[in-house]
Amino acid sequence: MYVGHVFRKALAQLGRPGLRVLDLCAAPGGKTTDLAASLREALGDDFLLLSNEVMKDRSRILSDNVAIWGDPNVMVTSVDPAAFAQFAAAFDIIVADVPCSGEGMFRKDPRAVEEWSEQTVQLCAARQKRILADVWPALRPGGILVYSTCTYEDAENDSNLEWAASELGGTIIAPEDEFPQFGVRLTRCGNLLRAGEVPGEGQWVGALVKSGVFTPGRADGRKARTGKDDGPLPGIRPLRYGVPAGTEKGGKLIPDPDYALSLGYRGEYPAIDLTREQALEYLHHDPLRFPDAPRGFCCVRFEGHPLGFVNNLGQRCNTLHPLSRRILMNIK
């Protein structure tokens, strides 16, 4: 994922405790998990990654994938980019993988070919300008915008980044000709990857620094949190922020299914180690029996990795694994 490569360069330049990053158009979540891994490797537990997806149906997919990834420092929202304008200088890095005319997806998705037209290119270019202008106040002076599309059109790529630098105020980071041997092309303002010349689908990525002075130091409330609350941006309600340990029912704490997957899980439940066959059966929601394991809530694991919880009753157990994540294919 080349956008992740460019992001890691920005992280190397600006990375510090308390860093805030916005993944503006984040669904389905592959980019978010890549960013989260890079942030955790560089900063440990001291960062916040806000992953946003304006489309409600896609935001639910994003939220579920973030839950499976298990990093409690990732917050998921579903708002229009304009909603972030009220939070002046809130983010150190903004990654904007914006909606585009989709030429880089032609090989993968026949619908992208059917929907393409010159008019679509112009409409997308205008929409991308609107998105960048809307979110621009939320990027702090000296912060970095990583801008990407999955198209080859100059109007949506180099020209739009040049427009942002000129009209919004910034300096384009000169792209590097790093991987020509792997088919990565150099353009005026970024790098172009064409489907058929590189593994995967087409992509264009560029970056710019917002004009102004970058001032290190933590503003009030910038510390990344790992509990579930209303989030660090008042007025924007998160779909997901941290993972609750569970919910109380009948005087008993029922563990949240996602808690087992979270990096915040402290291992307070007895562990049951599964064979590969048992692990598949658990994910397939087949009946399982653990007569020799402790009664009550247990965390089931495969090769040391938590998969979820069961309520072990001895001769049978009730799974807490979400039905929406059940393996549907025949596992035999």
Feature annotation, model-predicted:
Residues 199-204, 209-332:
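Polybasic, low-complexity RNA-engagement segments
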Residues 32-36:
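Conserved SAM-dependent methyltransferase scaffold
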Residues 91, 144-147, 151-237:
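Class I S-adenosyl-L-methionine
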Residues 54-89, 96:
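S-adenosyl-L-methionine
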Residues 16-27:
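Conserved class I S-adenosyl-L-methionine
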Residues 44, 139-141:
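Helix-to-beta-strand junctions that scaffold the AdoMet/dcAdoMet cofactor pocket
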Residues 57, 92-133, 146, 150-158, ...:
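Mobile active-site "lid"/loop adjacent to the S-adenosyl-L-methionine
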Residues 48-53:
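Conserved SAM-binding motif I beta-strand of class I
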